[in-house]
C-alpha cells in the first residue's frame, strides 16, 4: 500500500499536533483469523486511548496485523479547538501584504475593495461574485500548503529550489491573508457577511487561485509566471486572463511546420515530413506588439518579456513555454459579473443601418437550406421520431430548473420545487399540461436567467425556458444532430471522432500555396444582429419542410418548433438588480434552448460560407476544408500560386472587412501554419490543448457531495496534467484526504485509507497511480469491494413518498402506455427508475440520501461487514483470468514522432511506441443491430446496461421485448433467427466491457488499442470458438502491457494458456457483470 497512507498519517500528525491528539489505525482482512486479530487490535487501541495510555506497545504486539492486514481507515481525535491555521500562518507571513488598486477595473464591484465598501449592509451582500463554490475551505487549503512546506523544508538540490520558490510565493499569500485574518467558512463552505465585511471582497477566491498556482510551480519560469499572476490578480479581477492569453491567437501563426501528422484516407494520423513556412505580414506583428504593450500597461513584466524573447526565433522547441503561459492565465479564477452587466453586454452593440442586406440574405438562405437538408429525409419519410416528438421529449426531460418555484402536491406530501420534471408531472395531474401551446416570453412573461462563468471571458447569461420549449425542440434537434454526426464540417458532432482527427484535417492541406482562416465568432452568436436572420432562416426552413409531408403529427411538430422561434424573436428577460426585478427587452440569442449547440453550428457554418463566397469574387482559390466547432470556425483555402506576405495581409483585411459589413464583431485571423480556437490550437504542426481547469474554485454549486468533488478535483488534475499543467500530486492527495474525511463528532474524525478510495467500488475517488486504472484482484481488494456493494444504493423517504403518489405513478404509466404496444417490464421499470433518479436533483432528496450514505460508510469504515454477494464485477472476471498469464521482458522501439508536446513523459512514450487513435471506441451499443432496429420503430433509447441485459435473455423474450416497443413481428422474428443476433451478443458485450473499463477516458483515449505493435506482444493460442472470451483475454492483456509501460517505461510480453474447460465458465460469468457507478466514474463522465 503506497504513498497515500503514509502522507495521511503525516498529515494527521501535522494537523493534530497537540498532546491530546490520538491516531488509531483500523485494519481489516479477508482472512478470518487475521480479521479477528484486527478487531481485537482495534478495541485494545480504543481502550488504551480512553485511559490515556500509549499505543506503541500494541503496535509491536499486533505486528502481524500491521504487516499482513490492509489499512481500512484512520480514526483521529483531538480535543483542541483548532485556530491552528492562524497560528501556523504567522510563521509564513513575512512579506509585505498586497494592496489592491481600487480603480483598475471598469465595473466598481470588480475592484477588490473591502466588502463593506461594496455592500454597506448585510441585506445588500451577496457572495455570488466571489463564491469559490467548492466543498472545501480556504483554511483547509492553507493547511494543505503549510503541510507540504513543512514536510519539504529539508529538501536538497533541485527539490530545494522548488521549495524556495513555493515558500516565497506562499509568503505573499500568507502575509496578505494574515493582515485581515483567515475568513472562516460556515457549514456549507460559504463566506458570510460578518466574516467578510472587514476583508477584501475577493480575498477567498484570490487566495484559492493563488494556492492552486503556487502548488503548480516547479521551474523558475513557472515561478515567474505564477508570481506575476498572483500579484496582479489581487487587483485585476476582470481582464487579466484575457490580456495574458490574447497573444496566442497570433503566436500560432509564427511557427514554421517542419514535419507534422496528417489525416489519411483511413482517418488515421500518419507522419508527413512536409515543410511549410510561416508567412507573417508586418501588420500581424504590429497587432502582436499592441497586445504586448497592453500587457505591460496592465503591469505585467516577465510574461511579455518571455514572449518577446521567444519571438527572436519562434522555435517550436521553445513553444511549450508559450503554451504554459496560455494555460496558466486561466488559473487566476473565474470572472463573475453581476447578471445585469452580463445581459447588457450583449445589448450594447448599436444597430447600424449600413449593413450589407445582400449578405444577410445569403446568410439566412444558407441557414434555411441547411435546416432543410438536415431534416428532409426524416420529414419525407414521416419519421416516427417526428411523429412522437412529444413522447420523445418527455422521456428525455431534464430535471433542471423550469424558471419558477411552484407548490406541488404528491399524494399527502406538499413540496416547493422549480424542477422541470416535477412541473410536468404536476401539470399532467391537474390538467394544465398543454404541450401544444408554447408560452410567450414577451413583456408579460419575461425569461428568468441562469449564468455561465468562465475564466478570461465575460459572464454569459442562459435562458431558463419553460419545459414546453424543450418538448417542442427535442425531436427535431435530435434529427439535426444525427445529420451532423456524418457531416465532417461539424467537428464537434462528427461520428466518434476525437480532437486528433480535427487536428490531422487541418494539417492535411497546409502547404506553401494555402492559408487557413480562423475566426472566433462567440461575439456574433450572442449579438442582436444575428437574431432576425438566424431565427428567420430556421423558420423559412421549417416552412419548406412542412410542405414536404401530409402527416398531421409531423406538421404539428414542425409548427411547434416554428412557434418557439417566433416567440423568441420577441424576448424579454428578468434580471434581479438588488431587490427589484428588472424586465429588459432582449433581442439576442442566448444558450438555454435545446437547439443552442446545433443551431449555432449551423449558423456559424452559414456565416463562414457567406464570407468565403464574398472573398471568392476577388481571389481564386479552392476551399479544401470548412469546419465549425462550437464558437469557432475555420477554413483552409488553396490558391494557385505560392502565398506571399502581401496576399496574407490582403485576404486578412478583406475577410475582416467582409465580417464588418455584417456588423459582426469577431476576431478573424489568417495564417499559413496554425490555428487557435477555444478547444485546441495547432502550432508548428503540433497540437496543444489549454490546461485551464480550475481546481480550487468552481463555476457553480451543484448538489454533489464532498466525495464527488474530491473525485472531480482529481479528474481535473489529471486532465490538466495530460495537457501540460501539473499541480503537485502530494497537494492533490492532501486535498482528497481533507475532502473525504467524515466527521463523527466535533472532535472525532474518520479518514478512509487508500484502499477504500482507489478500489473500484461505489466509493472510488482516485487512482493510486496516475493514468492507470487498476482493478484489484487480491482477496482483500475483492473483499472490500463486496462490502461496499452491500451498501451501495441508499433509500430516501421523500423520494419513496413521491414515487408512491398517484401523480408520479400516473405519469410513469402514461409514458409507458404511449410508448409500449404490449407489456414490457424491463422498459416500464426502466422508465420508473429513470424518473425516480431525476428526483435526485431535488435538494432534500439528495441530502437525505447523502446522510444515509455517510452513516453506512461510517459503520463500514470501522468494521467491514462480510457480504456474500452473488453480483459479479469486472474485478472477478479479471481475477479469474490473471493466473493464466505469464509475462516476459520485451522491447518496442520508439517509432512515431511526437505531435502532442505537452503530454507527460510516460504517456508520450507509449504513443511513440504504439501510435495514437483518432476515434472513440463505441461503448454505448448504438452500433448494434438491435439498437438500430429499436430506433427505427420507437423513440425509446435503451442504455448499454439494458441492451446487455436484454441480449442475454431467451430468444422468445427478446422477441417480446422488441414487439412491445412497436417493432413488427416479422422484423423481430427475422432478427432473432438471423446471424446478426449472435453477432450482436458479441458486439454489445464488447461495448459493455469497454464502457466498464473506461477506455474512452483519461489517457487510454489516446492509445491505439488495435496497434499491431501492441498485438505482437501478446500470444494467446486459439482454443475453441468463443469470441467473447478471446476478446476479454486480449483486452486484459493489452491493458496489462500498457499499464506496465506507463509505470516502468519498458515493455513486457504476455503469454496466456487459458484452459478450454474454463472458457465456458468464464463466458457464462461474463453475462452477469454488474456495473459500478462511483464519484470517480461520474467525474470522468463529467469531463465529457
UniProtKB/Swiss-Prot annotation:
Q: Name one GO molecular function term.
A: RNA-directed RNA polymerase activity
Q: Which reaction does it catalyse?
A: RNA(n) + a ribonucleoside 5'-triphosphate = RNA(n+1) + diphosphate
- State the compartments where it is located: Virion
- Taking every annotated instance into account, which residue ranges of this chain make up the domain RdRp catalytic? 501-687
| GO CC, one annotated term | virion component
Reported EC number(s) for this entry are 2.7.7.48
What this protein is reported to do is described as: RNA-directed RNA polymerase that is involved in both transcription and genome replication. Together with VP3 capping enzyme, forms an enzyme complex positioned near the channels situated at each of the five-fold vertices of the core. Following infection, the outermost layer of the virus is lost, leaving a double-layered particle (DLP) made up of the core and VP6 shell. VP1 then catalyzes the transcription of fully conservative plus-strand genomic RNAs that are extruded through the DLP's channels into the cytoplasm where they function as mRNAs for translation of viral proteins.
- Protein name per UniProt: RNA-directed RNA polymerase
| Origin species | Rotavirus A (strain RVA/Human/United States/DS-1/1976/G2P1B[4])
